[in-house]
């Protein structure tokens, strides 16, 4: 068995040195762009940034976070990563899930490890006449807030079983036109 840091290291060696974990050479290096996950709010929180550092040191080029609904807490976590120089070594993408209902947020808060949903956000969605539409607006606000956090390079947007809403959310969040790279 290998853990996530070991797997990242194996992939980095396949890409950079052109060798498998066994030491056997590849016919050509693997063209990997290596990603990893970060759950900034999983207990014990104080160790999350250290685990992130290990993944980046192992070779992760980009990081996708677990769903983030509390941008103030997320900004604090990213600041800790930035103080360690991690945001200069790997792109941090904030995980943003489009909430469809207050019940969905309550479920995620109670049952998905590392997902923290502020009570005010749940109450706001519960009070809305059209929870789906309010969920779209919340998503736009979360994207805009994430983009203002120093060290965050983008978002990983997830609309579970409602992907058709993504173009309008992306447009409303000001993500268009896409930058030329």
Question: Model segments located where?
Answer:
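Short, well-ordered secondary-structure micro-motifs
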Residues: 46-47, 75-76, 103-112, 167-168
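Active-site pocket-lining/capping segments in soluble small-molecule metabolic enzymes
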Residues: 2-27, 37-42, 84-144, 173-181
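Conserved, mostly hydrophobic/aromatic
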Residues: 55, 59, 94, 155
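C-terminal/domain-terminus segments
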Residues: 149, 156-181
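Catalytic beta/alpha-barrel core
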Residues: 61-70, 154-159
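Structural motif
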Residues: 58, 149-150
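Glycine- and Gly-Pro-enriched alpha-helical subdomains that act as flexible
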Residues: 76-79, 94
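Active-site glycine-rich loop that binds ribose-phosphate moieties when present
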Residues: 20-21, 44-58
């Amino acid at each position: 068995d290998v853990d996530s840091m070991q797997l990242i290291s194996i992939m980095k060696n396949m890409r950079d040195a052109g060798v498998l974990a066994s030491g056997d050479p590849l016919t050509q290096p693997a063209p990997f762009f290596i990603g990893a996950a970060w759950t900034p709010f999983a207990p014990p929180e104080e160790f999350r940034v250290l685990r992130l550092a290990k993944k980046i040191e192992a070779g992760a080029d980009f990081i996708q976070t677990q769903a983030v609904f509390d941008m103030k807490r997320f900004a604090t976590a990213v600041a800790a990563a930035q103080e360690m120089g991690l945001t200069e070594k790997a792109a941090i993408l904030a995980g943003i899930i489009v909430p469809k209902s207050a019940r969905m947020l309550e479920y995620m808060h109670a049952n998905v490890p590392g997902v923290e949903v502020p009570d005010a956000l749940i109450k706001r969605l519960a009070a809305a006449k059209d929870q789906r539409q309010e969920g779209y607006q919340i998503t736009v606000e979360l994207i805009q807030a994430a983009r203002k956090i120093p060290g965050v390079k983008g978002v990983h947007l997830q609309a579970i079983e409602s992907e058709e809403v993504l173009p309008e959310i992306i447009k409303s969040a000001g993500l268009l036109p896409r930058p030329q790279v």
